Protein backbone atom coordinates (compact mmCIF):
# COMPACT_ATOMS: atom_id res chain seq x y z
CA UNK A 1 0.00 0.00 0.00
CA UNK A 2 1.41 3.38 -1.00
CA UNK A 3 2.04 6.25 1.38
CA UNK A 4 -0.33 8.32 -0.76
CA UNK A 5 -3.20 5.91 -0.13
CA UNK A 6 -2.52 5.87 3.60
CA UNK A 7 -2.57 9.66 3.56
CA UNK A 8 -5.85 9.69 1.65
CA UNK A 9 -7.50 7.29 4.08
CA UNK A 10 -6.22 9.28 7.05
CA UNK A 11 -7.74 12.38 5.45
CA UNK A 12 -11.12 10.65 5.12
CA UNK A 13 -11.11 9.99 1.37
CA UNK A 14 -14.07 7.62 0.78
CA UNK A 15 -12.69 6.38 -2.55
CA UNK A 16 -9.41 5.34 -0.93
CA UNK A 17 -11.31 3.59 1.85
CA UNK A 18 -13.50 1.81 -0.72
CA UNK A 19 -10.32 0.58 -2.40
CA UNK A 20 -9.06 -0.69 0.95
CA UNK A 21 -12.35 -2.52 1.42
CA UNK A 22 -12.09 -4.16 -2.00
CA UNK A 23 -8.55 -5.29 -1.25
CA UNK A 24 -9.11 -6.66 2.25
CA UNK A 25 -12.79 -7.48 2.78
CA UNK A 26 -12.45 -11.16 1.86
CA UNK A 27 -9.43 -11.60 4.11
CA UNK A 28 -11.21 -9.91 7.03
CA UNK A 29 -14.31 -12.03 6.47
CA UNK A 30 -12.33 -15.30 6.37
CA UNK A 31 -10.41 -14.29 9.48
CA UNK A 32 -13.66 -13.49 11.29
CA UNK A 33 -15.13 -16.85 10.36
CA UNK A 34 -12.09 -18.73 11.63
CA UNK A 35 -12.44 -16.94 14.96
CA UNK A 36 -16.23 -17.16 15.32
CA UNK A 37 -17.08 -20.34 13.35
CA UNK A 38 -20.30 -18.73 12.16
CA UNK A 39 -20.81 -17.36 8.63
CA UNK A 40 -23.50 -14.90 9.68
CA UNK A 41 -21.50 -13.60 12.63
CA UNK A 42 -18.45 -13.30 10.37
CA UNK A 43 -20.41 -10.94 8.13
CA UNK A 44 -21.34 -8.80 11.12
CA UNK A 45 -17.75 -8.80 12.35
CA UNK A 46 -16.49 -7.78 8.92
CA UNK A 47 -18.94 -4.87 8.73
CA UNK A 48 -18.13 -3.76 12.26
CA UNK A 49 -14.40 -4.02 11.51
CA UNK A 50 -14.55 -1.59 8.61
CA UNK A 51 -16.81 0.77 10.54
CA UNK A 52 -14.29 0.78 13.38
CA UNK A 53 -11.42 1.17 10.91
CA UNK A 54 -13.09 4.25 9.44
CA UNK A 55 -13.59 5.67 12.92
CA UNK A 56 -9.93 5.05 13.76
CA UNK A 57 -8.49 6.11 10.41
CA UNK A 58 -6.56 9.00 11.98
CA UNK A 59 -4.44 6.46 13.87
CA UNK A 60 -3.00 5.06 10.63
CA UNK A 61 0.71 5.74 10.33
CA UNK A 62 1.72 7.76 7.29
CA UNK A 63 4.42 5.27 6.27
CA UNK A 64 4.20 1.52 6.16
CA UNK A 65 3.14 -1.49 4.16
CA UNK A 66 -0.22 -3.18 3.87
CA UNK A 67 -3.00 -2.19 6.26
CA UNK A 68 -4.18 -5.80 6.35
CA UNK A 69 -2.53 -6.61 9.72
CA UNK A 70 -4.13 -3.48 11.18
CA UNK A 71 -7.56 -4.55 9.92
CA UNK A 72 -7.11 -8.11 11.18
CA UNK A 73 -6.21 -6.73 14.60
CA UNK A 74 -9.45 -4.74 14.66
CA UNK A 75 -11.39 -7.81 13.49
CA UNK A 76 -9.82 -9.85 16.29
CA UNK A 77 -10.98 -7.33 18.88
CA UNK A 78 -14.49 -7.25 17.41
CA UNK A 79 -14.57 -11.06 17.47
CA UNK A 80 -13.51 -11.03 21.12
CA UNK A 81 -16.56 -8.93 21.94
CA UNK A 82 -18.74 -11.46 20.18
CA UNK A 83 -17.05 -14.37 21.97
CA UNK A 84 -17.64 -12.78 25.36
CA UNK A 85 -21.32 -12.20 24.60
CA UNK A 86 -22.01 -15.54 22.92
CA UNK A 87 -21.73 -18.58 25.21
CA UNK A 88 -22.90 -20.84 22.42
CA UNK A 89 -19.63 -20.43 20.54
CA UNK A 90 -18.45 -23.99 21.00
CA UNK A 91 -21.70 -25.44 19.67
CA UNK A 92 -21.45 -23.17 16.64
CA UNK A 93 -17.85 -24.23 16.07
CA UNK A 94 -18.85 -27.86 16.05
CA UNK A 95 -21.75 -27.22 13.66
CA UNK A 96 -19.61 -25.14 11.31
CA UNK A 97 -16.96 -27.83 11.22
CA UNK A 98 -19.37 -30.36 9.72
CA UNK A 99 -21.54 -28.02 7.62
CA UNK A 100 -21.41 -27.60 3.89
CA UNK A 101 -19.58 -30.81 3.05
CA UNK A 102 -19.64 -31.37 -0.71
CA UNK A 103 -20.51 -34.73 -2.21
CA UNK A 104 -17.63 -36.59 -3.84
CA UNK A 105 -17.48 -39.09 -6.66
CA UNK A 106 -18.08 -42.74 -5.81
CA UNK A 107 -14.56 -44.07 -6.38
CA UNK A 108 -13.76 -46.37 -3.50
CA UNK A 109 -10.18 -45.49 -2.57
CA UNK A 110 -10.45 -41.81 -3.48
CA UNK A 111 -13.73 -41.44 -1.61
CA UNK A 112 -12.37 -43.18 1.48
CA UNK A 113 -9.37 -40.86 1.48
CA UNK A 114 -11.52 -37.77 1.10
CA UNK A 115 -13.89 -38.86 3.85
CA UNK A 116 -10.95 -39.33 6.19
CA UNK A 117 -9.58 -35.91 5.19
CA UNK A 118 -12.98 -34.37 5.85
CA UNK A 119 -13.10 -35.96 9.28
CA UNK A 120 -9.63 -34.66 10.08
CA UNK A 121 -10.56 -31.15 8.96
CA UNK A 122 -13.78 -31.27 10.97
CA UNK A 123 -11.88 -32.53 14.02
CA UNK A 124 -9.29 -29.77 13.63
CA UNK A 125 -11.93 -27.04 13.36
CA UNK A 126 -13.76 -28.39 16.40
CA UNK A 127 -10.47 -28.54 18.30
CA UNK A 128 -9.72 -24.96 17.23
CA UNK A 129 -12.89 -23.87 18.99
CA UNK A 130 -11.63 -25.57 22.16
CA UNK A 131 -8.37 -23.64 22.31
CA UNK A 132 -8.00 -20.75 24.71
CA UNK A 133 -8.86 -17.49 22.97
CA UNK A 134 -5.30 -16.03 23.05
CA UNK A 135 -3.87 -19.23 21.56
CA UNK A 136 -6.56 -19.42 18.90
CA UNK A 137 -6.02 -15.80 17.84
CA UNK A 138 -2.27 -16.23 17.41
CA UNK A 139 -2.66 -19.52 15.54
CA UNK A 140 -5.22 -18.09 13.11
CA UNK A 141 -3.17 -14.96 12.41
CA UNK A 142 0.18 -16.72 11.95
CA UNK A 143 -0.80 -20.02 10.31
CA UNK A 144 -4.01 -19.29 8.42
CA UNK A 145 -3.56 -15.61 7.65
CA UNK A 146 0.17 -15.99 7.12
CA UNK A 147 1.23 -12.95 9.13
CA UNK A 148 4.81 -12.58 10.26
CA UNK A 149 5.35 -12.72 14.02
CA UNK A 150 5.95 -8.96 14.16
CA UNK A 151 2.73 -8.19 12.24
CA UNK A 152 0.72 -10.56 14.45
CA UNK A 153 2.23 -8.91 17.52
CA UNK A 154 1.18 -5.46 16.29
CA UNK A 155 -2.30 -6.71 15.41
CA UNK A 156 -2.79 -8.15 18.90
CA UNK A 157 -0.85 -5.53 20.82
CA UNK A 158 1.50 -8.03 22.44
CA UNK A 159 5.29 -8.66 22.31
CA UNK A 160 6.75 -10.83 19.55
CA UNK A 161 8.05 -13.26 22.17
CA UNK A 162 4.51 -13.76 23.44
CA UNK A 163 3.34 -14.52 19.91
CA UNK A 164 6.03 -17.18 19.56
CA UNK A 165 5.26 -18.86 22.89
CA UNK A 166 1.48 -18.81 22.36
CA UNK A 167 1.85 -20.21 18.87
CA UNK A 168 4.05 -23.04 20.11
CA UNK A 169 1.52 -23.95 22.81
CA UNK A 170 -1.39 -23.61 20.39
CA UNK A 171 0.17 -25.98 17.87
CA UNK A 172 0.78 -28.64 20.49
CA UNK A 173 -2.68 -28.36 22.05
CA UNK A 174 -4.43 -28.25 18.66
CA UNK A 175 -2.68 -31.43 17.55
CA UNK A 176 -3.66 -33.30 20.72
CA UNK A 177 -7.24 -31.99 20.77
CA UNK A 178 -7.74 -32.80 17.09
CA UNK A 179 -6.56 -36.39 17.59
CA UNK A 180 -8.90 -36.82 20.55
CA UNK A 181 -11.81 -35.39 18.55
CA UNK A 182 -11.01 -37.58 15.54
CA UNK A 183 -10.92 -40.68 17.74
CA UNK A 184 -14.26 -39.69 19.25
CA UNK A 185 -15.81 -39.27 15.81
CA UNK A 186 -14.57 -42.67 14.74
CA UNK A 187 -16.02 -44.30 17.87
CA UNK A 188 -19.37 -42.67 17.14
CA UNK A 189 -19.41 -44.25 13.69
CA UNK A 190 -19.10 -47.79 15.03
CA UNK A 191 -22.68 -48.15 16.42
CA UNK A 192 -24.05 -46.76 13.16
CA UNK A 193 -22.12 -49.35 11.17
CA UNK A 194 -23.44 -52.09 13.43
CA UNK A 195 -26.96 -50.80 12.99
CA UNK A 196 -26.60 -50.82 9.20
CA UNK A 197 -25.37 -54.41 9.33
CA UNK A 198 -28.20 -55.37 11.66
CA UNK A 199 -30.81 -53.75 9.43
CA UNK A 200 -29.36 -55.53 6.39
CA UNK A 201 -29.53 -58.92 8.15
CA UNK A 202 -33.10 -58.22 9.25
CA UNK A 203 -34.24 -57.30 5.74
CA UNK A 204 -32.58 -60.33 4.15
CA UNK A 205 -33.99 -62.67 6.79
CA UNK A 206 -37.49 -61.22 6.40
CA UNK A 207 -37.31 -61.60 2.63
CA UNK A 208 -36.20 -65.21 2.93
CA UNK A 209 -39.01 -66.01 5.34
CA UNK A 210 -41.49 -64.39 2.99
CA UNK A 211 -40.42 -66.70 0.16
CA UNK A 212 -41.06 -69.86 2.15
Model-derived features: where do they sit?
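A short pre-motif secondary-structure segment
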Residues: 138-142
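Helix-turn-helix DNA-binding motif, specifically the short coil turn and the N-cap/start of the second
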Residues: 38, 148, 157-162
